[in-house]
Structure formats: structure tokens, C-alpha cells
Amino acid sequence: MPREHDKQSKFAPSHLGTKPVEYKRNKGKKMHDKSGETPIIMQTKGE
């Protein structure tokens, strides 16, 4: 029955439960500011 095993190895489900954990965690790497400058903070509500 090696044929059925080959089918399973090619199957890649796209629903959220099968995504690797690092896929969810690595957003910080993308959003990280590499310029080294301090961010300009804009006040949206009065304090």
C-alpha cells in the first residue's frame, strides 16, 4: 500500500489548524523597524 502513503504526503491542507506555529509568531520580524530612529508619536486624543 505505498501508493496511499504517497497521496497523503502530497496533500497540503490550507485550513488554519495545520499552519506551523512560527507562521503566526514571525509577524514581529516583518514589523520590526530596522532604521534605528525613534518613532514619531502622533497624539490622536487629548490628555
Swiss-Prot record:
Induction: Expressed only in the forespore compartment of sporulating cells. InterPro entries: SASP_SspN. Pfam families: SspN. It is found in: Spore core. One of its GO terms (biological process) is sporulation resulting in formation of a cellular spore. Keywords: Sporulation. GO terms for cellular component: endospore-forming forespore. Its main location: other. The keyword Transcription does not apply. Residues 1-47 are annotated as: Disordered. Belongs to the SspN family. NCBIfam families: PRK09398.1. This is Small, acid-soluble spore protein N. It comes from Bacillus licheniformis (strain ATCC 14580 / DSM 13 / JCM 2505 / CCUG 7422 / NBRC 12200 / NCIMB 9375 / NCTC 10341 / NRRL NRS-1264 / Gibson 46).
